[in-house]
């Protein structure tokens, strides 16, 4: 028991790193898992197939994943708080409610998504030459949606109780399988985009089964029992109270990016391929910063539940410093190796040139996001989710949307699109700093407010 709760006891920087590294390594393998599709189709099928899986499809998949990662964070925060408070009864009720929620929503979203795929792609002005492959990929993806949501829920629960290692082991194994399946189905069996979609969904199914098995075999404090998977209304309300604002935040974020993708789609196939591939490459940066965000959410949640307010506040400061150091190193490395990284995905010289220019333009501004990622994670762990959601929706999403409809028609071009990112990050970062200093708990009495 003591070993599993070092988050509330150990040296902060050391425990943050112990918790962070499995998350960031796991996120790296998740990115490899996703990127393998693009590399295989880009090099063995063609740039049209690369654009199909990297453009509108990537934005739609990201929207769905981000929404449900947001909802799973509701379960994660509540479970972390109950675990820190050693309230095992409510911990287990939340665990079983979360799994019931994942199964039901996975089935519903899969059915709806399959039905509206083509309509959404048309609404996004997906180029006609990319439509067939995009529809095939998304239809197969939606057939396996339940696996995706169950895995994310299970992994989120494990991290909430301080176990960031076993989700990593699952990802490493399924990542290797995904690459193997990609090569077999695309390179040897010539199945194209259908092959990478089948490979992805198959591995998501394996991931979901493995993380569920881990929870079934877990210790008695938070063991999943299949017969007890049901909705406990009080637990569901607590999960949704945290999860819905986070999911709405993620939804608005991705809707803004979907709108941006529509404008990018009008700039030609090469730009679409470069933009979509950029999202694969710079994910290396986001996985580092967001892993610190996940870590601080769990740290704050458990210490909040245990009533250790000063330790909770100190962990935020330590996490910010560590995040900035890592963010600067990663963005500098990506900047320096922009062209070689693009050549991993495609041999088309024009796509490489456009993509490298994108990276050189945007990467110097990425440091501004660190404050947003860490402070929003900390506030979430303390149960403050509504205002951070409004800050993100207004400061990031609405500004980007207004920018695209107000500025882009006057100064059209990819650089105008890219400029919306640093502008929105800068404004939102200032808003988060102000709110954090005003509302983040300073005393135990504020926990009860």
Give the residues covered by each predicted segment.
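Small-residue-rich hydrophobic transmembrane alpha-helices
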Residues: 50-111, 148-167, 275-338, 369-392
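Transmembrane helical elements of multi-pass membrane transporters/channels
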Residues: 18-37, 140, 151, 174, ...
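Helix-terminus/linker motif at the lipid-water interface of multi-pass membrane proteins
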Residues: 28, 32-51, 121-128, 184-191, ...
């Amino acid at each position: 028991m003591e070993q599993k709760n070092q988050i509330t006891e150990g040296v902060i920087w050391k425990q943050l790193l112990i918790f962070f590294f499995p998350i960031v390594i796991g996120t790296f393998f998740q990115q490899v898992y996703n990127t393998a599709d693009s590399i295989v189709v880009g090099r063995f099928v063609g740039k049209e197939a690369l654009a199909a899986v990297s453009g509108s499809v990537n934005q739609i998949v990201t929207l769905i994943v981000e929404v449900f990662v947001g909802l799973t964070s509701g379960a994660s925060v509540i479970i972390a708080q109950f675990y820190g408070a050693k309230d095992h009864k409510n911990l287990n009720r939340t665990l079983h409610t979360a799994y019931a929620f994942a199964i039901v929503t996975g089935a519903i979203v899969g059915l709806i998504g399959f039905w509206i795929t083509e309509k959404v792609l048309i609404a996004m002005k997906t180029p006609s030459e990319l439509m067939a492959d995009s529809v095939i990929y998304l239809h197969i993806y939606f057939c396996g949606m339940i696996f995706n949501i169950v895995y994310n829920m299970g992994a989120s629960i494990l991290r909430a109780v301080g176990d960031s290692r076993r989700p990593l082991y699952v990802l490493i194994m399924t990542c290797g399988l995904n690459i193997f399946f990609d090569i077999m189905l695309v390179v040897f069996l010539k199945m194209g985009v259908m092959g990478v979609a089948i490979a992805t969904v198959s591995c998501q199914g394996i991931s979901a089964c493995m993380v569920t098995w881990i929870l079934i075999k877990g210790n008695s404090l938070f063991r999943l029992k299949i017969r007890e998977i049901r909705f406990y209304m009080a637990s569901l309300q607590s999960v949704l109270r945290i999860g819905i604002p986070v999911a709405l935040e993620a939804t608005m974020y991705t809707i803004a990016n979907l709108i941006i993708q529509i404008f990018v789609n009008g700039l030609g196939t090469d730009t679409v391929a470069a933009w979509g591939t950029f999202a694969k490459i710079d994910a290396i940066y986001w996985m580092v910063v967001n892993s610190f965000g996940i870590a601080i959410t769990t740290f704050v949640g458990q210490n909040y539940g245990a009533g250790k307010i000063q330790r909770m506040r100190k962990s935020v400061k330590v996490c910010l410093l560590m995040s900035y150091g890592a963010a600067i190193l990663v963005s500098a490395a990506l900047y320096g190796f922009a062209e070689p990284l693009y050549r991993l995905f495609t041999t088309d010289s024009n796509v490489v040139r456009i993509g490298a220019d994108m990276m050189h333009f945007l990467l110097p501004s990425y440091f501004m996001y660190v404050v947003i990622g860490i402070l929003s994670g900390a506030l979430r762990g303390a149960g403050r989710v509504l205002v951070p959601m409004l800050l993100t929706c207004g400061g990031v999403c609405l500004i980007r949307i207004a920018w695209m409809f107000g500025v882009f028609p006057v100064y059209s071009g990819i650089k105008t699109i890219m400029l919306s990112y640093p502008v929105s990050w800068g404004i939102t970062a200032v808003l988060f700093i102000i709110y954090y200093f005003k509302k983040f708990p300073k005393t135990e009495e504020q926990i009860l407010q």
